[in-house]
């Protein structure tokens, strides 16, 4: 690896920000299966896109059908899954995008690694704190039923641990908050951080 060198880009990050009209960031959704990560990530993505923001969603199931299809659900593979996604999110941020990442990401150390990969002021951790009981009651993919029946091993919350975030930027229980309420609160947070303005853009003077 010592013979590898990072090749600089002709287009600077600042130039991309000025063209896009907003700053890049990674919004990292973490929580149990069924807590609403993909639903809220996609709703937020649509909200931002309609306001002219350049966005993308990285979803756990989607990534495992391509980039990470060689990985299983052992602890080692889960760690590698999140590491790869963190690196992809970093590249997308370098390209100027607002990236919503929807991953169970059960281990605190892995989420911390992603935070360290990115610029601190461009990482927003959103913990969907919906209880195991509520998530299992929803069971949109039938995964909890399979895990309880012994048909699915290493399932988070059943026979594999989930470590709640120590200091998430935002936390919501989706059993008591609607999708629109959560999306609106996240958008307000992005506005407060200067990532976007209320109409979706950041002025040139705010970039730095």
Swiss-Prot record:
CDD domains: APSK. One of its GO terms (biological process) is hydrogen sulfide biosynthetic process. ATP binds at residues 31-38. Pathway: Sulfur metabolism; hydrogen sulfide biosynthesis; sulfite from sulfate: step 2/3. The active site is at 105 (phosphoserine intermediate). PANTHER family: ADENYLYL-SULFATE KINASE 1, CHLOROPLASTIC, BIFUNCTIONAL 3'-PHOSPHOADENOSINE 5'-PHOSPHOSULFATE SYNTHASE. This is Adenylyl-sulfate kinase. It comes from Pseudomonas entomophila (strain L48).
